[in-house]
Amino acid sequence: MSAILVLITAPAEAAPALARALVEARLAACVNLLPGLRSVYRWQGEVCEAGETLLIAKTTSARFSALREAVLRLHPYELPEIVAVKLDDAHPPYLQWLLSQVSDSPSP
């Protein structure tokens, strides 16, 4: 089971509830919210700019599919950004904690 970071952008007003839902469902061990992000993107033929919050969810590759489905269900965007990045290395005790928090039989 490998640890991953999942990057998700969301409107500032939706981000805290989304983060809490992912942690409560044990789909992520932790979600950092980085407010104040400005995104520039092309949508439906137009260049757009929007203020967003970046969510960085720590989870495992085994939980990614369920996390993605939860984000798609809860997210206000028609096409939310959900990007997984593999972790090559991490502080071993932190990695153990992360894995335990998204397991079916978590430790405290």
Predicted regions and their residues:
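Positively charged, small/polar-rich N-terminal and surface patches that mediate targeting and assembly
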Residues: 1-108
